[in-house]
Amino acid sequence: DGITVNRISLANIQKVSNCKADLYIEKRLTGRYYLIRNVEIPNGVTLILDNFTNFNTAAGEFGLYIKLTDGDSFELTGDINPGNGTTTVPGTNTIFLSEVSVGDDIEISGETRTVTDIITDVSLTVSATYSDDLTTDTTPTCNPTALVDVIIN
């Protein structure tokens, strides 16, 4: 309330994929005004919006909202055999440090888990164990989260 926004920066900090962003101002009764809509931000790129026209930021007037959509799913490098009864997932010829981020979903042999830690290029941990009877998956899939740093000043 009563805050002036001069610049907004959105930086895609994902390791591999692009993300999409919507940035809009919404007034309680009159709807949304999109500053950007469905804009794809490549990984490693910062989108800067500045020179905002002043708008009434009195209590209850406007809200500033950012909606982020993750990038497309992609096939991970290497093979994964998670059927070891633990949340530690071993890989063979994988490059987890380069391709995966904490919060990403990993699908292995039809089962999906969320990455909670990346230990090395060939080892990460997930939110729950995979079934013990899974065989090695040579085409594991990553569904990345939308990792974007937002700076408003």
Task: Please identify what each model-predicted range represents.
Residues D1-I3, R7, A11-V16, K20, ...:
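C-terminal interaction-tip segments
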Residues I25-K27, T53, A128-Y130:
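A short beta-strand motif that forms part of the nucleic acid-binding face
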Residues K15-R37:
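Short, surface-exposed beta-strand/strand-loop-strand elements in extracellular ectodomains
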Residues I3-R7, T46-I48, T88, S123:
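Intrinsic-disorder/low-complexity, polar/charged segments enriched in Ser/Thr/Lys/Arg/Asp/Glu/Gln
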Residues D1-G2, I13, T53-T57, N93-F96:
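Extracellular and analogous surface-interaction loops
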Residues L29-S73:
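Aromatic- and Gly/Pro-enriched, solvent-exposed loop/edge beta-strand patches characteristic
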Residues L23-I25, I36-N38, D50, K67, ...:
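Beta-strand-rich, repetitive solenoid scaffolds
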Residues S73-P144:
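Autoprocessing Asn-cyclization modules and mimics
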